[in-house]
């Protein structure tokens, strides 16, 4: 907002009338402005003093004192025409021109008087005032000093010299001048008021108050002192006292534009914009060229959203004062808000051309660069802003956002700390810092920040929603649900809260209004996609939702595009890639250089499944680089991969652009994304395209939607070509099953029949037929649970074994099952176990029941390795077909894969009631574990390498990525040369 002189008015008696003029009036005319209007005064004069120059000059003086400057000038000029050598009249004419803001004419008439009377001290004083108003304070000071030299006891000149020194920041000299003026004239209210201004400028508010009060005591009608008192109250936040005193100032001096400007500011601060505009318009009536008044009117229109009016008034302000910095800055803001961004940039640059270190203009220009994804220039502007000001929090906040987007979480948190140092009650900064803490796993600190934000701003829906997310991440699901609902109470149209509440409810089997909520969420997603807004449903959640696969593809595309935007913020030039020459050909590499990027090299299902893969690659043909996005968790899985991979780089502390540079410097030919859209992913690295071929594999069972990912490694069952339209990548079909595991190397103990645990060890009934599902509860839905309940009711003495995954879902699941007629003892929940124990105890189940909407992938592999048959129903999306592929790769898929829920139910009941049939299937499954392709990790690695060479050879031949199938007897690959 533009601010006028809303503190102390820099007062100086702008014009001084000489003693000679006073002597003229010693013959006292019966003319009094206080008792007559200007018109009656003129009538009275015309009757009695028509040809009397002294009387006419006295009349002009009276009109001047009454504020009728134009009439005063007319009569003074009549005297001037008859007698141009009257210096007292020249002094008065100069004074009138000053009041009319015609400063050049003021100076000219005073110079004319000085040519006649060179020792006329008052003329020098008045010229000094005019030069000061023209902005030449140094010349003004010279003229004040001449006036004082000519007349050392000229108290008014000492007072006005003080105001000039104050304008130059020479506070000590200004104070001495005020004190000298008051020693000459203790009743000089101007000097008392100026001394108050000096005290205020030095932070001595009580002393300033005393000075202003003394001025009012001496002269209760002294409007400027009332105005300055009002300024003190305004700055202390006592707006009602400020309002009272500014009103008194304009009542005492109706022609007081600065007081009207400040009165308008008080009304504006009190939320009374109509009265504020009226005050600014009063100021304009007295000072039509007041840029400040136009600017302040514009600021009100801006805050009211009347941007066209705001722009018009800002332009009027600039037409009056082309060097009005705040008007350029604020006009830029208004233009930006209506989409005229290029014009806004020109305004900010114009402001900076006039004042290169203008903090608001630098920050606002930085905001635009930030929106344009020009993060380098934006950062530079924010840092430059902070170099010239210490009181602005916005540049710290924006730098924090940039640092966070670039993965520089430490600096982001430091910047948010600075925001909160400047404004400890900044709820937005608390939420943003909480988000940063949450992103790096410091959930407890995130929760504290969100709760503090809510304490400061209880109606802040975002704080409640983010608190809910942190509660969910820390396992406090019920608290999460409560907080999401509170966020939606505060803001019913809150897409992120709506979508996240739905996901949280699915995690705990809360299916009330499920269809209605999914319809609402799907509507939100489609609307966001049409508006080119990042969808509130993440791709990882979309794979488990009953939504159209094409819609899931569109969600992934939007997230991929967002990653491209993040990548562009680093401003890297395009990478140069290794030459497209076949491996082992002249000029080519001796080995294919493969890079794996993951945040899951540690205690994570990905490492449980792929632990041996990185060391199993054939070093004669392939050179493997692993890039770890997460810090060392010191687990056996991390140590194993780190020791067995040919090259292992911990890049967790590096920014994404630095990681991309390293990958490119390592001359990686094929880069594998093992995260996709899972936690810890940094897909912006792939958006920078550091490698010529980029592949999605294993971490995310769905399409990335990314133009910068060329291939998806999958298999014919999981991603048949008939469904290729729901993928953005070209499909690479590995033989058998794409889903690798390491159990043959790491979990041999499961094969020992003597190591089988007892059901009683886990509170499982020895006499019941146990169905089991070890998937997370969010993968379940009423349709499949209804089917399970039907199965339990049809199979005597049966039970369903589930995991507290999470524990908060147990009671809701039990309640739902009971409503379907299932007995309480037929539902058994146990805690989640460590990996090896989980696989060992899985053998205690008789049949595994899979979830169709999102299969058991890792858990599906677990139970098949344990030798327990699994019933699965494949649908269309990738995540719904993985379990079927696992079953097929055992060679026994026909006994476990079904085509409908009806068939699913019948298969489960049939296996439970036909003991010989189940025993035969179980025996076959257990016998196949050491020979079937599903658990042959080395065989799988060779097939994966075949796919890599096919990708590279296609690239070398100049062909675009294309769907292809890997054959185990393909002679194209080095294994078979």
UniProtKB/Swiss-Prot annotation:
Gene Ontology biological-process annotations: negative regulation of flower development; protein O-linked glycosylation; vegetative to reproductive phase transition of meristem
Keywords: Developmental protein, Glycosyltransferase, Repeat, TPR repeat, Transferase
UniProt effect for mutating residue 776 to A: Reduced activity
One GO MF term attached to the UniProt entry: protein O-acetylglucosaminyltransferase activity
Enzyme nomenclature, EC number: 2.4.1.255
UniProt xrefs under InterPro entries: OGT (IPR037919), OGT/SEC/SPY_C (IPR029489), TPR-like_helical_dom_sf (IPR011990), TPR_rpt (IPR019734)
Function: O-linked N-acetylglucosamine transferase (OGT) that mediates O-glycosylation of capsid protein (CP) of virus in case of infection by Plum pox virus. OGTs catalyze the addition of nucleotide-activated sugars directly onto the polypeptide through O-glycosidic linkage with the hydroxyl of serine or threonine. Probably acts by adding O-linked sugars to yet unknown proteins. Its OGT activity has been proved in vitro but not in vivo. Required with SPY for gamete and seed development. Mediates O-glycosylation of the DELLA protein RGA, a repressor of the gibberellin (GA) signaling pathway.
Sequence similarity: Belongs to the glycosyltransferase 41 family. O-GlcNAc transferase subfamily.
Protein known as: Probable UDP-N-acetylglucosamine--peptide N-acetylglucosaminyltransferase SEC
Organism, scientific name: Arabidopsis thaliana
